[in-house]
Amino acid sequence: MKRIKILSFVLPLLTLLCSSCSLETDNDAGRLEGMWHLVSVETISTGVTEDLSEQVVFWSFQAKLLQLEDKTGQVNSYLYRFRIDNDQLRLSSPYLFDRENGDHLLTAYEATLGRYGIKSLTPTFRIEKIDRRKMILNDGAVRLYFDKF
């Protein structure tokens, strides 16, 4: 009888634990997961490539969020929600990253987004290549080259 009472308490508890919020385990980032160093930006129309390999500009993917950050701290950082569909990376809901005063939703393009290879407020990129060490994204205007950090 005592065993039945214990099991009647423990089994529902285990069920609740296994079915609880899954935000931490949902990984929409898939192969994009982690930190990527932006090493160059190629302007497709001109063929001009800007070398950023000595800069500290990073895209970091985790769960459903993307953080754009210049590690010097001299340029604004940004947050995006993202979705991947058929090798298309769609960025939405851009925020100015400001932990001290609260993040601010962007309603207009900011020129400092260009530092990260972003040329419009909510771009869509084609994932041209991705493996454990390299990633190439293309939005039709620029091609972004990344190394996994």
Label every PLM stretch briefly.
Residues 1-10:
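Bacterial N-terminal signal peptides that target proteins for export
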Residues 11-15:
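Residue-level signal for mature regions of secreted extracellular proteins and peptides
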Residues 17-20:
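C-terminal motif of bacterial Sec signal peptides marking the signal peptidase cleavage site
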Residues 22-37:
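N-terminal helix-cap/turn-to-beta initiation motif at the start of protein domains
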Residues 33-35, 62-67, 130-136:
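Short, hydrophobic/aromatic-rich segments at coil-to-beta transitions
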Residues 42-53, 64-130:
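Contiguous, well-ordered beta-strand patches that form the walls/edges
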Residues 79-87, 130-149:
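Edge beta-strand at a domain terminus
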